[in-house]
């Protein structure tokens, strides 16, 4: 929790702390960078560094105040080359009006004004200082402030505001971006208070594997198609529930009814076959006799 000497706005709610712990935002890596030592709470027996959740919350509120101080929301550029943060930065940009760069950062975006992708933001926010090193380096050339989500092993060179958190887990990254967007909207007046429930759930900021989602959709479609085929087959075959209760001769013994129906069908088929056979024999015999009688006559005429 935040120290008591700080303003009340820095005090998080119990639900916020529970969400940070559930998303494992407090779990760092086994390596520790010297500038991240002030944000360390303790070292676990297995060598994992545990971050101070209270300081994480303080930096989220501080970063939100910096973002809200910029008049034009489009002058804020949010960047994530890490796949787990690309969905989060896109959602953050859509909710706050910022400019998102999800995926590979093209070198020269902040320094080469000839390129079409040239941008002049007043503030950039990166998901990982290590994977987004090119963006931080170019921001240092043109004096752009940098806010970064930093793990215990993240380099903090040219980072102005470091938010200590786990920047490698999909849930931790999504939750921090969601809380940052919520605080920005609260400071802008879109949300009345922090206790006001935001209609955007945090799940929208979590990374989703496209292949897993596609396989899930295919499996759901196959299940629905199989159920439809089974239902259609039952209707076409006539084996509905009410047909079994129909009162008919032999209804109590389905085998007897089936045998009687089969015998009747076989007798009808045999009668039809004999009749057709007799007609076929009669029609084929006459042409054979006529051909035999006519053939020798033709031969005698030629000789």
Swiss-Prot record:
Biased composition (Low complexity): 269-286
GO cellular component, one term: cytosolic small ribosomal subunit
One GO term of the biological process aspect: ribosomal small subunit assembly
Alphabetic keyword roster: Cytoplasm, Ribonucleoprotein, Ribosomal protein
Tree of life domain: Eukaryota
Region (Disordered) residue spans: 269-303
Pfam family, one: Ribosomal_S2
Known function: Required for the assembly and/or stability of the 40S ribosomal subunit. Required for the processing of the 20S rRNA-precursor to mature 18S rRNA in a late step of the maturation of 40S ribosomal subunits.
Protein name: Small ribosomal subunit protein uS2
Protein source organism: Penicillium rubens (strain ATCC 28089 / DSM 1075 / NRRL 1951 / Wisconsin 54-1255)
């Amino acid at each position: 929790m935040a120290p008591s000497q700080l303003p009340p706005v820095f005090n998080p709610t119990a639900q916020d702390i529970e969400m940070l712990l559930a998303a494992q935002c407090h779990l760092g890596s086994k390596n520790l960078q010297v500038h991240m030592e002030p944000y360390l709470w303790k070292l676990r027996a297995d060598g994992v560094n545990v971050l101070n959740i209270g300081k994480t919350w303080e930096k989220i509120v501080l970063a939100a105040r910096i973002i809200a101080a910029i008049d034009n929301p489009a002058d804020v550029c949010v960047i994530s080359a890490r796949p787990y943060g690309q969905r989060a930065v896109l959602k953050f940009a859509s909710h706050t009006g910022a400019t998102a760069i999800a995926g590979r950062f093209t070198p020269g975006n902040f320094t080469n004004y000839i390129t079409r992708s040239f941008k002049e933001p007043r503030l950039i926010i990166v998901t990982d200082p290590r994977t987004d090193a090119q963006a931080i380096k170019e921001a240092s050339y043109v004096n752009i402030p940098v806010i970064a989500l930093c793990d215990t092993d993240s380099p903090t060179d040219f980072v102005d505001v470091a938010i200590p958190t786990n920047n490698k887990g999909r849930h931790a990254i999504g939750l921090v971006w969601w809380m940052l967007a919520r605080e920005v909207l609260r400071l802008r007046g879109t949300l009345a208070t922090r206790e006001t429930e935001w209609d955007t759930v945090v799940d929208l900021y979590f990374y989703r594997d496209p292949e897993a989602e596609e396989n899930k959709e295919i499996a759901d479609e196959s299940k629905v198609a199989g159920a439809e085929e089974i239902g259609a087959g039952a209707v076409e075959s006539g084996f509905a529930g009410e047909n079994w209760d129909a009162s008919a001769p032999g209804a109590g013994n389905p085998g007897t009814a089936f045998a009687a129906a089969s015998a009747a069908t076989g007798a009808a088929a045999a009668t039809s076959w004999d009749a057709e056979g007799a007609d076929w024999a009669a029609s084929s015999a006459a042409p054979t006799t006529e051909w035999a009688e006519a053939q020798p006559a033709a031969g005698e005429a030629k000789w």
